[in-house]
Amino acid sequence: MDMFSLGQGNNTTTSLEPFGTGGNDTGLSNVTFSYQVITSLLLGTLIFCAVLGNACVVAAIALERSLQNVANYLIGSLAVTDLMVSVLVLPMAALYQVLNKWTLGQVTCDLFIALDVLCCTSSILHLCAIALDRYWAITDPIDYVNKRTPRRAAALISLTWLIGFLISIPPMLGWRTPEDRSNPNECTISKDHGYTIYSTFGAFYIPLLLMLVLYGRIFRAARFRIRKTVKKVEKKGAGTSFGTSSAPPPKKSLNGQPGSGDCRRSAENRAVGTPCANGAVRQGEDDATLEVIEVHRVGNSKGHLPLPSESGATSYVPACLERKNERTAEAKRKMALARERKTVKTLGIIMGTFILCWLPFFIVALVLPFCESSCHMPELLGAIINWLGYSNSLLNPVIYAYFNKDFQNAFKKIIKCKFCR
């Protein structure tokens, strides 16, 4: 986002001029042909990949019915926004970077800055809308099913564009300094201190704080739900083990594994005198009703395992079943840990990419206007920070769509032209 571009000013101090462009002939002002060729290739590749990636996401949602849901509508709107950044903003930004001076006039400059701020701010706020939708879905899944409507998604999308509009328009209405238009070779946004605070906090710092809070709560809720599921499984396993046995463990078969017949004999030996026939429920001598569970052999025959009666009669679960329950519980625990690690990894990628792309830019954008006379920003570093922010429009479709198996299947269909048939 070229909200606050960085570069060398007309004197030895640093100002917020785009991509290192300034009125003097230091640094990158006298660009070489090789610099222009290399920069054109790099930026052209970035723009092409951003356009292609976001266009594929939009096409996948439009053509694949299984992707047409509220969550993916937000991802599709994000792709449209990033596509607008790639088509409307990045070509002019690349031209400015390659030529190292603004050549399109003041009116085009104002339009360029307004589109830049509007689209990039909306892109960032779309990430907040997606985080908010996911937070509601995981913390209130039952009620939110009915609330998660296309109308709600449209309201969130409209809000992102409204906030972007409120941040991008003020400089065009006069919230700027006289120096902002003093050099026709430069295209800079307002360096007014009030607008700097207003725009940086509205476009980044407040959304960043909101995303950190939301994804933190999403992680806690997901971890709680995963561990709750594991506890239920463990309780179920414990619920089938109604007693412990002092009898020796069942004998092993020739292959070293507990035999099914041994399980049956172990159960029968312990259930002395318990009336039971053919898996049916029958009255005991003490007139208490017994619940019967069947333990099957590998073969066709089957034995019967009585459970405790209300009068306190004691029975036992074969050791082989207890070990099976333990193995099942252990497998569930491992699956839960894997899901928890995957959740941490996914949220880490989402937040890590967003912070890596935009935090350096907005730190400089907030600090430089207040220390213009004493701060120095190398021109090359300023250009890298600028384009690092722009690259977020390339990475968003990768993070939010290409890691999704449903999107992957849709992309394969697009590549194979199955939608054309």
Curated annotation (Swiss-Prot):
InterPro entries listed in its UniProt record: 5HT1A_rcpt, 5HT_rcpt, GPCR_Rhodpsn, GPCR_Rhodpsn_7TM
Sites where a glycan is attached: 10-11, 24, 30
SUPFAM superfamilies the record matches: Family A G protein-coupled receptor-like
Sequence motif NPxxY motif, location on chain: 396-400
Residues given in the record as 1D-myo-inositol 4-phosphate binding sites: 314, 345-346, 352, 403-405
Listed GO biological process terms: adenylate cyclase-inhibiting serotonin receptor signaling pathway; behavioral fear response; exploration behavior; gamma-aminobutyric acid signaling pathway; regulation of behavior; regulation of dopamine metabolic process; regulation of hormone secretion; regulation of serotonin secretion
Residue spans, topological domain Cytoplasmic: 60-73, 133-152, 217-346, 404-421
Membrane topology summary: Multi-pass membrane protein
Disulphide bridges: 109-187
Molecular function terms from GO: G protein-coupled serotonin receptor activity; Gi/o-coupled serotonin receptor activity; receptor-receptor interaction; serotonin receptor activity
Recorded coiled-coil stretches: none
Tissues where the protein occurs: Most abundantly expressed in midbrain, in dorsal raphe and hippocampus. Detected at lower levels in amygdala and brain cortex.
UniProt entry tagged with the keyword Disulfide bond: yes
Bilayer-spanning residue ranges: 39-59, 74-98, 108-132, 153-174, 194-216, 347-370, 379-403
Activation/inhibition comment: G-protein coupled receptor activity is regulated by lipids: phosphatidylinositol 4-phosphate increases HTR1A-mediated activity. Plays a role in the regulation of dopamine and 5-hydroxytryptamine levels in the brain, and thereby affects neural activity, mood and behavior. Plays a role in the response to anxiogenic stimuli.
Region spans: Disordered: 237-268
Deleted gene: phenotype: Mutant mice display decreased exploratory behavior and increased fear-related behavior in anxiogenic environments. Mutant mice display altered monoamine metabolism in specific parts of the brain, especially in dorsal and medial raphe nuclei, thalamus and hypothalamus, leading to altered levels of 5-hydroxytryptamine, dopamine and their metabolites, as well as altered noradrenaline levels.
Major site of localization recorded for this protein: membrane
Keywords: Behavior, Cell membrane, Cell projection, Disulfide bond, G-protein coupled receptor, Glycoprotein, Membrane, Receptor, Transducer, Transmembrane, Transmembrane helix
A Gene Ontology cellular-component term: plasma membrane
Family of this protein: Belongs to the G-protein coupled receptor 1 family. 5-hydroxytryptamine receptor subfamily. HTR1A sub-subfamily.
Subunit text: Heterodimer; heterodimerizes with GPER1. Interacts with YIF1B. Interacts with GPR39 and GALR1.
The protein's name in its UniProt record: 5-hydroxytryptamine receptor 1A
The gene coding this protein: Htr1a
